[in-house]
UniProtKB/Swiss-Prot annotation:
The gene is OR1E2. It is a multi-pass membrane protein. InterPro entries: GPCR_Rhodpsn (IPR000276), GPCR_Rhodpsn_7TM (IPR017452), Olfact_rcpt (IPR000725). This is Olfactory receptor 1E2. Residues 50-57, 121-148, 229-245, 302-323 are cytoplasmic. It comes from Homo sapiens (Human). It comes from the Eukaryota. Belongs to the G-protein coupled receptor 1 family. Residues 1-25, 80-100, 168-205, 270-281 are extracellular.
Length: 323
């Protein structure tokens, strides 16, 4: 399909971030530090969950996949951004641009599905604590959040995102791009590419609206529904300590959900007529750079289970014979 594309350009030019030349080195160091923090933090989560058997539970299965998704999501855009800032070469080949767009959609969709799975896991843990305890510690196959169900949810998320990202990529590949090849963004954003196309983009726009509702809005509503049930269940708890514990358990997930869905829905599904390039860039930075970096801190590095796992792994390294 890409071979039939009638584009007359071989590459695009990414304008990058609106940064003054004298601020270039400082911003480069800042974004490099943020990217390395994202990589190391999410890798630490994945390794700890893999090595510590106490973390082989539904919530940490979803969290390890979310950390891997965040790691890859950030890696889709950040290396090219850092390279352009360092080399002052904003060009990106046409095929590479479509490839970047594909993986950007892939991992953003995957994050959306995994956030829903984690919300449902919190719902089961709080509203059905006896079932959840049996699942987590006795490994019984129950009708609620069984290990097979958890693995199926993760596998289905990976498969569905593949088809959705491929659909948008193939639709983009059929468009014609003429003289204008300047993308006012720091990555190959789908909406920015559509504005450069010199052929009819109505099919693309309808697919974005319809599939966006399925991939973003419906999962967001499912998350809100799960937390509505959670709040209703929490308010029935007579103990103030239990209420505080339940809210602290859900608060971290809700903060990431608000940051991710708020910016994505506002940027792609509810764009304003007077939306500026700077505003769109800042919003994109929030969910492509900031959210993946904050995930380890919000979810795990302040989590008692993760701290315990880190201590056990360190102790095993010091004393291999320690059980």
């Amino acid at each position: 399909m890409m071979g039939q594309n009638q584009t007359s350009i071989s590459d695009f030019l990414l304008l990058g971030l609106p940064i003054q030349p004298e601020q270039q080195n400082l911003c480069y160091a800042l974004f490099l530090a943020m990217y390395l923090t994202t990589l190391l933090g999410n890798l630490l989560i994945i390794v700890l969950i893999r090595l510590d058997s106490h973390l082989h539970t539904p919530v940490y299965l979803f969290l390890s996949n979310l950390s891997f998704s965040d790691l890859c999501f950030s890696s889709v855009t950040m290396p090219k951004l850092l390279q352009n800032m360092q080399n002052q070469d904003p060009s990106i080949p046409y095929a590479d641009c479509l490839t970047q767009m594909y993986f950007f959609l892939y991992f953003s969709d995957l994050e959306s599905f995994l956030l829903v799975a984690m919300a449902y896991d919190r719902y089961v843990a709080i509203c059905f604590p006896m079932h959840y305890t049996a699942i987590c510690f006795l490994l019984h196959y129950t009708a609620i959040m069984s290990p097979m169900l958890c693995l199926s949810v993760v596998a289905l998320s990976w498969v569905l995102t593949t088809f959705h990202a491929m659909l948008h990529t193939l639709l983009m590949a059929r468009l014609c791009f003429c003289a204008d090849n300047v993308i006012p963004h720091f990555f190959c954003d789908m909406s920015a590419l559509l504005k450069l196309a010199c052929s009819d983009t109505r099919v693309n726009e309808w697919v974005i609206f319809i599939m966006g509702g399925l991939i973003l809005v419906i999962p967001f509503l499912l998350i809100l529904g799960s937390y509505a049930r959670i709040v209703s269940s929490i308010l029935k708890v007579p103990s103030s300590k239990g209420i505080c514990k339940a809210f602290s358990t859900c608060g971290s997930h809700l903060s990431v959900v608000s940051l991710f869905y708020g910016t994505v829905i506002g940027l792609y599904l509810c764009p304003s007529a007077n939306s500026s390039t700077l505003k769109d860039t800042v919003m994109a930075m929030m969910y492509t750079v900031v959210t993946p970096m904050l995930t380890p801190f919000i979810y795990s590095l302040r989590n008692r289970d993760m701290k315990g796992a880190l201590e056990r792994v360190i102790c095993k390294r010091k004393n291999p014979f320690l059980l």
